Amino acid sequence: LILFIGFKIVSYVVKMAHKIFERSIMDTTLQTFLLSFIKIGGKVLVIFMAVTKIGVAASSIVALLGSAGLALGLSLQGSLSNIAGGVILLLLKPFQVGDYIIEGNSGKEGTVQAIGIMYTKLLSVDNKAIMIPNGNLSNASITNVTYQEKRRVDLNVGIEYSEDIKKVRKVLNALIEKEPARITDEPVKIYVNEFQASSIDIGIRYWVKTEDYWESRWRVLE
Protein backbone atom coordinates (compact mmCIF):
# COMPACT_ATOMS: atom_id res chain seq x y z
CA LEU A 1 0.00 0.00 0.00
CA ILE A 2 2.83 2.39 0.89
CA LEU A 3 4.56 1.64 -2.41
CA PHE A 4 1.35 2.14 -4.41
CA ILE A 5 0.44 5.45 -2.76
CA GLY A 6 4.06 6.61 -2.70
CA PHE A 7 4.63 5.97 -6.40
CA LYS A 8 1.36 7.76 -7.21
CA ILE A 9 2.58 10.79 -5.25
CA VAL A 10 5.95 10.69 -7.02
CA SER A 11 4.21 10.57 -10.42
CA TYR A 12 2.05 13.55 -9.42
CA VAL A 13 5.10 15.53 -8.25
CA VAL A 14 6.93 14.74 -11.51
CA LYS A 15 3.92 15.93 -13.56
CA MET A 16 3.67 19.14 -11.54
CA ALA A 17 7.40 19.76 -11.89
CA HIS A 18 7.12 19.17 -15.65
CA LYS A 19 4.36 21.79 -15.94
CA ILE A 20 6.39 24.29 -13.90
CA PHE A 21 9.50 23.67 -16.01
CA GLU A 22 7.52 24.13 -19.24
CA ARG A 23 6.39 27.58 -18.09
CA SER A 24 9.95 28.55 -17.21
CA ILE A 25 12.85 29.50 -19.49
CA MET A 26 14.87 26.50 -18.32
CA ASP A 27 16.89 24.65 -20.95
CA THR A 28 15.14 21.50 -22.27
CA THR A 29 18.13 19.26 -21.56
CA LEU A 30 18.29 20.46 -17.97
CA GLN A 31 14.53 19.90 -17.58
CA THR A 32 14.89 16.26 -18.65
CA PHE A 33 17.78 15.69 -16.26
CA LEU A 34 15.96 17.22 -13.27
CA LEU A 35 12.74 15.32 -13.96
CA SER A 36 14.68 12.04 -14.07
CA PHE A 37 16.42 12.95 -10.82
CA ILE A 38 13.09 13.74 -9.09
CA LYS A 39 11.49 10.53 -10.35
CA ILE A 40 14.34 8.21 -9.35
CA GLY A 41 15.04 9.98 -6.07
CA GLY A 42 11.36 9.95 -5.13
CA LYS A 43 10.98 6.23 -5.81
CA VAL A 44 14.11 5.42 -3.78
CA LEU A 45 12.67 7.42 -0.87
CA VAL A 46 9.32 5.59 -1.10
CA ILE A 47 11.04 2.18 -1.11
CA PHE A 48 13.12 3.23 1.91
CA MET A 49 9.96 4.23 3.79
CA ALA A 50 8.20 0.99 2.86
CA VAL A 51 11.10 -1.18 4.04
CA THR A 52 11.36 0.62 7.38
CA LYS A 53 7.59 0.27 7.82
CA ILE A 54 7.77 -3.53 7.70
CA GLY A 55 10.26 -3.59 10.54
CA VAL A 56 13.73 -3.40 9.03
CA ALA A 57 15.87 -0.99 11.04
CA ALA A 58 16.71 2.24 9.25
CA SER A 59 20.31 2.02 10.46
CA SER A 60 20.69 -1.38 8.78
CA ILE A 61 19.32 -0.04 5.52
CA VAL A 62 21.64 2.97 5.63
CA ALA A 63 24.64 0.74 6.34
CA LEU A 64 23.70 -1.61 3.50
CA LEU A 65 23.15 1.25 1.07
CA GLY A 66 26.41 2.83 2.16
CA SER A 67 28.40 -0.34 1.50
CA ALA A 68 26.69 -0.92 -1.83
CA GLY A 69 27.17 2.71 -2.79
CA LEU A 70 30.89 2.58 -1.99
CA ALA A 71 31.42 -0.58 -4.04
CA LEU A 72 29.39 0.79 -6.92
CA GLY A 73 31.17 4.12 -6.74
CA LEU A 74 34.61 2.50 -7.01
CA SER A 75 33.56 0.38 -9.97
CA LEU A 76 31.85 3.27 -11.76
CA GLN A 77 34.32 6.03 -10.96
CA GLY A 78 34.76 6.99 -14.62
CA SER A 79 31.03 6.92 -15.25
CA LEU A 80 30.32 9.05 -12.19
CA SER A 81 32.84 11.65 -13.36
CA ASN A 82 31.02 11.78 -16.69
CA ILE A 83 27.68 12.25 -14.93
CA ALA A 84 29.18 15.01 -12.78
CA GLY A 85 30.65 16.55 -15.92
CA GLY A 86 27.23 16.47 -17.56
CA VAL A 87 25.70 18.28 -14.59
CA ILE A 88 28.44 20.93 -14.76
CA LEU A 89 27.85 21.45 -18.48
CA LEU A 90 24.10 21.74 -17.96
CA LEU A 91 24.45 24.26 -15.14
CA LEU A 92 27.29 26.44 -16.48
CA LYS A 93 26.18 26.20 -20.13
CA PRO A 94 29.49 26.88 -21.92
CA PHE A 95 27.59 25.80 -25.03
CA GLN A 96 24.15 24.58 -26.06
CA VAL A 97 22.62 22.39 -28.74
CA GLY A 98 23.33 23.89 -32.16
CA ASP A 99 26.62 25.56 -31.19
CA TYR A 100 29.86 24.75 -33.03
CA ILE A 101 32.60 23.97 -30.51
CA ILE A 102 36.25 22.90 -30.45
CA GLU A 103 37.43 20.70 -27.56
CA GLY A 104 40.88 21.85 -26.46
CA ASN A 105 42.56 18.60 -25.38
CA SER A 106 41.85 16.40 -28.39
CA GLY A 107 41.05 19.09 -30.95
CA LYS A 108 37.73 17.42 -31.80
CA GLU A 109 35.19 19.85 -33.20
CA GLY A 110 31.68 19.94 -34.55
CA THR A 111 28.10 21.09 -34.04
CA VAL A 112 26.56 20.05 -30.72
CA GLN A 113 23.72 17.60 -31.41
CA ALA A 114 22.89 16.50 -27.87
CA ILE A 115 24.14 16.97 -24.31
CA GLY A 116 23.53 13.68 -22.53
CA ILE A 117 24.19 12.60 -18.97
CA MET A 118 27.31 10.62 -19.95
CA TYR A 119 28.37 11.96 -23.34
CA THR A 120 28.03 15.03 -25.55
CA LYS A 121 27.40 14.28 -29.21
CA LEU A 122 28.99 16.44 -31.92
CA LEU A 123 28.45 16.33 -35.68
CA SER A 124 31.58 17.14 -37.69
CA VAL A 125 31.54 19.10 -40.95
CA ASP A 126 32.04 15.81 -42.85
CA ASN A 127 28.94 14.35 -41.14
CA LYS A 128 30.68 12.15 -38.57
CA ALA A 129 29.18 11.64 -35.11
CA ILE A 130 31.70 12.40 -32.34
CA MET A 131 30.96 11.27 -28.79
CA ILE A 132 32.98 13.06 -26.09
CA PRO A 133 32.74 11.94 -22.43
CA ASN A 134 31.34 14.77 -20.32
CA GLY A 135 34.09 14.30 -17.75
CA ASN A 136 36.71 15.11 -20.37
CA LEU A 137 34.70 17.95 -21.84
CA SER A 138 34.02 19.66 -18.50
CA ASN A 139 37.77 19.67 -17.71
CA ALA A 140 38.94 20.88 -21.12
CA SER A 141 39.22 24.32 -22.65
CA ILE A 142 36.29 24.83 -25.01
CA THR A 143 36.15 27.22 -27.94
CA ASN A 144 32.54 28.10 -28.72
CA VAL A 145 32.79 29.32 -32.30
CA THR A 146 29.12 30.26 -32.57
CA TYR A 147 28.85 32.08 -29.24
CA GLN A 148 28.78 35.47 -31.00
CA GLU A 149 26.40 36.51 -33.76
CA LYS A 150 29.19 37.39 -36.19
CA ARG A 151 32.53 35.81 -37.04
CA ARG A 152 35.65 36.99 -38.82
CA VAL A 153 36.86 35.15 -41.91
CA ASP A 154 40.67 34.98 -42.18
CA LEU A 155 42.23 33.85 -45.46
CA ASN A 156 45.73 33.79 -46.95
CA VAL A 157 46.60 34.05 -50.64
CA GLY A 158 50.14 33.37 -51.87
CA ILE A 159 51.49 35.49 -54.74
CA GLU A 160 54.85 35.59 -56.50
CA TYR A 161 57.40 38.27 -55.71
CA SER A 162 57.06 39.59 -59.25
CA GLU A 163 53.39 40.46 -58.71
CA ASP A 164 52.28 44.05 -58.09
CA ILE A 165 51.08 44.04 -54.45
CA LYS A 166 48.95 47.16 -54.86
CA LYS A 167 47.18 45.67 -57.86
CA VAL A 168 46.62 42.37 -56.04
CA ARG A 169 45.18 44.19 -53.03
CA LYS A 170 42.82 46.13 -55.28
CA VAL A 171 41.57 42.95 -57.02
CA LEU A 172 41.09 41.08 -53.73
CA ASN A 173 39.32 44.02 -52.13
CA ALA A 174 36.89 44.21 -55.06
CA LEU A 175 36.25 40.46 -54.73
CA ILE A 176 35.45 40.67 -51.02
CA GLU A 177 33.30 43.77 -51.48
CA LYS A 178 31.07 41.70 -53.77
CA GLU A 179 30.75 38.81 -51.29
CA PRO A 180 26.99 38.65 -50.50
CA ALA A 181 27.43 37.36 -46.94
CA ARG A 182 29.86 40.08 -45.89
CA ILE A 183 28.72 42.43 -43.11
CA THR A 184 29.03 45.80 -44.79
CA ASP A 185 29.35 47.71 -41.52
CA GLU A 186 32.68 46.00 -40.86
CA PRO A 187 35.80 47.03 -42.83
CA VAL A 188 37.64 44.70 -45.22
CA LYS A 189 41.33 44.22 -44.46
CA ILE A 190 43.80 43.26 -47.21
CA TYR A 191 47.40 43.20 -46.00
CA VAL A 192 50.85 41.62 -46.41
CA ASN A 193 50.84 38.82 -43.86
CA GLU A 194 54.21 37.15 -44.34
CA PHE A 195 57.19 36.84 -46.68
CA GLN A 196 57.85 33.22 -47.61
CA ALA A 197 60.89 31.81 -49.41
CA SER A 198 59.19 31.80 -52.80
CA SER A 199 56.00 33.80 -52.26
CA ILE A 200 54.30 36.63 -50.41
CA ASP A 201 51.29 35.78 -48.26
CA ILE A 202 48.47 38.29 -48.60
CA GLY A 203 46.01 38.21 -45.69
CA ILE A 204 42.28 38.81 -46.08
CA ARG A 205 39.90 39.65 -43.25
CA TYR A 206 36.19 40.37 -43.33
CA TRP A 207 33.15 39.68 -41.15
CA VAL A 208 30.02 37.58 -41.73
CA LYS A 209 27.12 36.29 -39.66
CA THR A 210 28.18 33.17 -37.79
CA GLU A 211 25.77 30.91 -39.67
CA ASP A 212 27.20 32.14 -43.01
CA TYR A 213 30.85 31.51 -42.11
CA TRP A 214 31.61 28.26 -43.94
CA GLU A 215 29.58 28.98 -47.07
CA SER A 216 31.20 32.40 -47.42
CA ARG A 217 34.70 31.04 -46.82
CA TRP A 218 34.29 28.29 -49.40
CA ARG A 219 32.74 30.67 -51.92
CA VAL A 220 35.62 33.15 -51.67
CA LEU A 221 38.25 30.40 -51.90
CA GLU A 222 36.69 29.18 -55.15
Question: How should these model regions be labeled?
Answer:
Residues 1, 16-91, 125, 129-150:
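Membrane-contacting alpha-helices and adjoining membrane-interface segments
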Residues 1-14:
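Hydrophobic alpha-helical transmembrane segments
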Residues 15, 170-174, 222:
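Generic recognition of well-ordered alpha-helical segments
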Residues 83, 171-172, 216, 220:
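Hydrophobic alpha-helical membrane-association signature
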Residues 88-184, 207:
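Soluble accessory domains appended to multi-pass membrane transport proteins
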Residues 163, 184-222:
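Solvent-exposed, non-transmembrane regulatory segments of membrane-associated proteins
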